Every structure is written in C-alpha cells, then in structure tokens.
C-alpha cells in the first residue's frame, strides 16, 4: 500500500493555520473559564439569607425558573453574573442597601433571562473561528455594550421617571466605586476574572460616549435614539 501524502499548497497551509489558531483560541477560553471558576470556589461566601431571599423573589418576577445563587467575594469590584447551568450573581464584599441591591439584582437577572451569557459564549466561539479578523473582536466589545443597554432598557421600561432617576443614581454610585479602584492591582485581576468567566457585569470599563449614551437611555428613554440604541431595541 502506498501511503497517501497530501500535496503541499499554500491554501492547505492557510487552512491548517486557521484551524490551529481556532483550536488554540477556543481551548484558551475553556481553560481560563475552568481556572477562574476553580479559583473562585476558595474565595467566595454565600450571600446572607435575607439577600438570597430577595434575589429569589426578583428572579421569579423576571421569569427565571432555575435557582440563582448569590455569592460574595473580595475578587471583584462590581457585580457580575456568570454560569451556564449553575447561575451565580457575584457581588463585592461591601455593604449594599435594599434599594441598590434590588436594582443590581434586577439588572443581573435580566442578563440571565435574556441568555446574555450564552450570547457571549457564542461570540467567543465566533471570535475563535475568525481569530484573525480584528472586526470580530470589535464586534465582541460592542455586543457586550449593547447587551448592557438592553438590560438597562428592560429594567427601566416600566419605571416611573423618578424611579428611573434612582436607578441612574445606583449605576453612578457603582461606577464611582469601580473608578476609585480602577487603577489598582485588584482592578486588573477583576478584569481578567470577568473575561475568563464570560460573564455579564453591572458596571463595565466603557468610556466617554458609551457611558453618556447609557445614561441618556436611562434618563431620557423617549429621546430619539442613536443607531446603537436602535440595535438594542431590535435585540429585544
């Protein structure tokens, strides 16, 4: 029998490099996720019974049938939701009053209800397939922003103007707390952790126009929307 040896062509080489790059990219995402979840197990505690009970009530109102666990940790500066089957809302180890926690939990439950974590996972796979295309990675960043806007819109859609202002104040308070620690080493660890968890965060590291656009959507929901806001509306 003659051993078949494929003929070398530049096309075959490019396809081989493409496949190898995709396998490496997706493998790294999976490994980072596994390590992040494993590391968190040793650095989290359960939320108080009162906070867990309130989260249970909010998740039920959002139409979530599965149990959403509340965990507290020193590893993050701002709340984050993660988990594909075991749903977890992770909050920083600091005091939250009922008002702030209620709006944060509602926002994070909207992410769960909208399957945003799965959308981010599919986006990671897409970026893994087209790892060589910079536009794929820009799409990932903009999509995360759009998903945050969609949750803000859903949370505030049935709120009065005064309560929208309160939600805005909660968001600003969390952004301020995030900014105060942003330059610290803890912030770098948090950014890496959130990225590894493929999670959704209440506060992101967006700047400038994106922050303004997010605030405008909350405070002026009836104002003529920009192109990106129309995308968010379409996603709903």
How does the language model describe each region?
Residues 1-236:
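Hydrophobic topogenic segments
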């Amino acid at each position: 029998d003659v051993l078949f040896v494929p003929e070398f062509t530049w096309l075959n080489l490019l396809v081989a490099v493409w496949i190898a790059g995709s396998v490496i990219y997706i493998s790294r995402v999976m490994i980072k996720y596994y390590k992040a979840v494993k590391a968190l197990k040793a650095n989290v505690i359960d939320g108080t019974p009162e906070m867990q009970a309130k989260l249970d009530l909010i998740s039920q109102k959002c139409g979530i049938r599965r149990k959403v666990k509340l965990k507290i940790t020193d590893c993050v500066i701002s709340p984050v939701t993660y988990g594909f089957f075991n749903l977890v809302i992770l909050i920083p180890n600091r005091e939250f009053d009922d008002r702030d926690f209620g709006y944060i939990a509602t926002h994070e439950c909207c992410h769960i209800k909208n399957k945003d974590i799965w959308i981010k996972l599919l986006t990671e796979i897409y970026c893994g397939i087209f790892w060589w295309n910079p536009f794929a990675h820009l799409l990932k960043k903009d999509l995360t922003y759009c998903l945050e806007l969609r949750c803000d819109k859903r949370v505030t859609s049935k709120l009065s103007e005064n309560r929208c202002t309160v939600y805005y104040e909660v968001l600003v308070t969390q952004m301020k707390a995030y900014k105060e620690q942003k330059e610290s080493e803890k912030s770098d660890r948090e950014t890496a952790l959130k990225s590894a968890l493929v999670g959704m965060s209440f506060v992101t590291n967006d700047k400038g126009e994106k922050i303004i656009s997010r605030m405008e959507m909350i405070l002026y929901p009836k104002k003529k929307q920009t192109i990106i806001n129309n995308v968010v509306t379409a996603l709903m």
